[in-house]
């Protein structure tokens, strides 16, 4: 099997279609923001608040630090080798064929599940306006629209995601500003007060146990940041754009998440936040700001579609990279004249379309089930990034090479992140809603190992 960079060169020399470097720095930053700011913030935050109370703010801070360390590790590798397949390429090259096979297919499955979760959430948001229309109809409609956009070319995808993400970012800034105005102008109602952060049982209202358990749900909110690595093969000037994206994206995510949460928890008592709807829409609806609530619901809908849009992009590129490595069927390397990995895109879409059936059969449980499965696969992906980076740095040291964009706290940071992610996985085993996904993870790894061995024998 050839590595990704070698095959890319061979393909180019034969003048066959390859992935186009059509993404600028602004695209990359907002693609990563678009992949992370979505249902995890607007819908998934409800269960986290119920578990941790106001201390959920601390939970997001801790998870954000871990996410930043891992993204710096990924960023260091990507700047040195900006190839298709991202961390699956590095796992393959520096750990071995099975590590690349495991990383790539696990990431692909994760973003298929993310896509299903976001389409499910989009259907839930649409029920705010059309309560009688089932979620599966909306999931099917948005599935068709987003995949059609991605079939055109990477530049159109980048522009679409840029505007999707920009709408989200501006809306979050506006929501924080409007919330602060409501809070300090007296227009936020009788319940609005900064005292809400400690009035109902204190800041650690559910104790340290509640805070620690909430981390399993909080991790869902940070999934998608690794899209920075996926964009590398189509980034213009990756040596400059990737470091900027890595450094700025995590800061902005933390600002948006923690800023939004402070406003949310101050405007409304955390004990009244529900887990089955968007807390943000609920608060403005209860404040009789129906116009604002509808506008915010529209933004939240865009947020979900944005994350799914990012997932369609990343999944097709990951499959392309797997095929280049020899870890997926060769027909998936086919690239259209416009630079779109067409067969990879179509296969990913075909599997994601099962979300329509899931929402039809399990309309009330679909989102919770999908979120738990996403968290389990996300933990494995990030652990593989940390492990691949350890081998990458060892290889650089043997070659006497100095990297341009160094990860922080190496190697202690790698082991810290692995221990943290392992702790989250153990916590999931104690939670009724997440236990199944944690148990299925080792089964999934064994299945992939057997599939890998079978393919190698053939």
Swiss-Prot record:
Record-annotated membrane-spanning stretches: 28-48, 51-71, 106-126, 133-153, 161-181, 197-217, 251-271, 289-309, 342-362, 368-388, 412-432, 435-455
Outcome reported for the amino acid change (mutating residue 252 to D/E/F/W/P): Loss of activity
Effect on the protein of changing residue 92 to L: 41% of wild-type phenylalanine transport activity
Mode of membrane association: Multi-pass membrane protein
KW Cell division (keyword) present: no
Effect in UniProt of substituting residue 26 to G/S/Q: Strong decrease in phenylalanine transport activity
Record keyword Transmembrane present: yes
Cellular compartment(s): Cell inner membrane
Result of altering residue 98 to L: No effect on phenylalanine transport activity
Consequence of changing residue 168 to N: Loss of activity
InterPro entries named in the record: AA-permease/SLC12A_dom, Amino_acid_permease_CS
GO cellular component: a single term: plasma membrane
Functional description taken from the UniProt entry: Permease that is involved in the active transport across the cytoplasmic membrane of phenylalanine. Can also transport tyrosine, but not tryptophan.
Descriptive protein name: Phenylalanine-specific permease
Gene from which the chain derives: pheP
